[in-house]
Amino acid sequence: HEEQITQPSATNDEA
């Protein structure tokens, strides 16, 4: 399940 979390994710690297 994909949860929309409001925290820096290490898996979602978009810097």
UniProtKB/Swiss-Prot annotation:
Lineage: superkingdom: Eukaryota
Additional notes on this entry: On the 2D-gel the determined pI of this unknown protein is: 5.5, its MW is: 62 kDa.
Protein name: Unknown protein from 2D-PAGE of needles
Organism of this sequence: Pinus pinaster (Maritime pine)
